């Protein structure tokens, strides 16, 4: 479990997170929603151990996450940032292999990297120059890198995948495929923390949603109870209508 206890983050006299209490459990998909500047990405970086809190603590399996070495953390959690810039002409496969580490399970890193590319519908991109790929293709390659990192770290303990706006460059087909993959990983015991802007996607795939604004958690819960017209109005300052999906019965958000 990753546990944030009374976490605040202050940078340059500006409060980015304030008194955050949150737990990410293995085997669940948690989606964080909120307007620009709400603190979503800051929370992800803090939970991942990349940004130390100014106050409070982040624990991984009841131990301060700051006590884990980078090598230990890399086996336990993988992070997909909003943007990754590479200035050298690596192939897509070489980028994915950057996520590989000496496996604890004896698996072949190259085979796992190829499998990860296939998982995100990017196997045909393996030998392409990463710099020549479209934004969506690069995003899928980076997702494959994160998968490879997790797969080559199997055996170190419960694992977590942190996704910061992973659908931003993807078309509709690959948005859906990515979130189905996140659900699949959660079903296998991975704790997935995902930052999104799309309320509809969050409602259809999340086990739990965090609604953030001004560095605080405004509401937390299952999509069916959290996605309400009142919450949408409070956080986004827009009026909406909430209807049940005809198949899943999960909430669908329509902005007036």
Swiss-Prot record:
Residues binding ATP: 34-41
Compartments, as annotated in UniProt: Cell inner membrane
Alphabetized SUPFAM superfamilies for the sequence: P-loop containing nucleoside triphosphate hydrolases (SSF52540)
Keywords for this protein: ATP-binding, Cell inner membrane, Cell membrane, Membrane, Nucleotide-binding, Translocase, Transport
Membrane topology reported for the UniProt record: Peripheral membrane protein
GO annotations of cellular component type: plasma membrane
E.C. code: 7.6.2.-
Family, similarity comment: Belongs to the ABC transporter superfamily. Heme (hemin) importer (TC 3.A.1.14.5) family.
Known partners and oligomeric status: The complex is composed of two ATP-binding proteins (HmuV), two transmembrane proteins (HmuU) and a solute-binding protein (HmuT).
UniProt protein name: Hemin import ATP-binding protein HmuV
């Amino acid at each position: 479990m990753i546990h944030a206890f009374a976490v605040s983050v202050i940078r340059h006299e500006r409060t980015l997170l304030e008194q955050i209490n949150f737990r990410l459990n293995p085997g669940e998909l948690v989606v964080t929603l909120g307007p620009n500047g709400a603190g979503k990405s800051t929370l992800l970086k803090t939970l991942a151990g990349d940004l130390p809190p100014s106050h409070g603590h982040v624990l991984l399996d009841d131990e301060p996450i700051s006590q884990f070495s980078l090598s230990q953390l890399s086996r336990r959690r993988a992070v997909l940032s909003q943007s990754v810039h590479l200035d050298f002409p690596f192939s897509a496969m070489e980028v994915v292999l950057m996520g590989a580490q000496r496996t604890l399970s004896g698996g072949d890193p190259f085979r796992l990297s190829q499998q990860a590319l296939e998982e995100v519908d990017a196997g045909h991109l393996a030998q392409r120059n990463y710099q020549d790929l479209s934004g969506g293709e690069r995003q899928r390659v980076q997702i494959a890198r994160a998968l490879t990192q997790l797969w080559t770290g199997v055996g170190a303990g419960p694992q977590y995948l942190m996704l910061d706006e992973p659908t931003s460059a993807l078309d509709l087909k690959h948005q859906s495929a990515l979130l189905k993959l996140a659900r699949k990983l959660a079903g296998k015991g991975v704790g997935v923390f995902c930052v999104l802007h799309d309320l509809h996607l969050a409602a259809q795939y999340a086990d739990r949603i965090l609604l953030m604004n001004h560095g605080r958690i405004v509401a937390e819960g299952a999509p069916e109870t959290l996605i309400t017209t009142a919450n949408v109005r409070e956080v986004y300052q827009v009026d909406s209508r909430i209807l049940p999906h005809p198949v899943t019965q999960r909430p669908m958000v329509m902005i007036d």
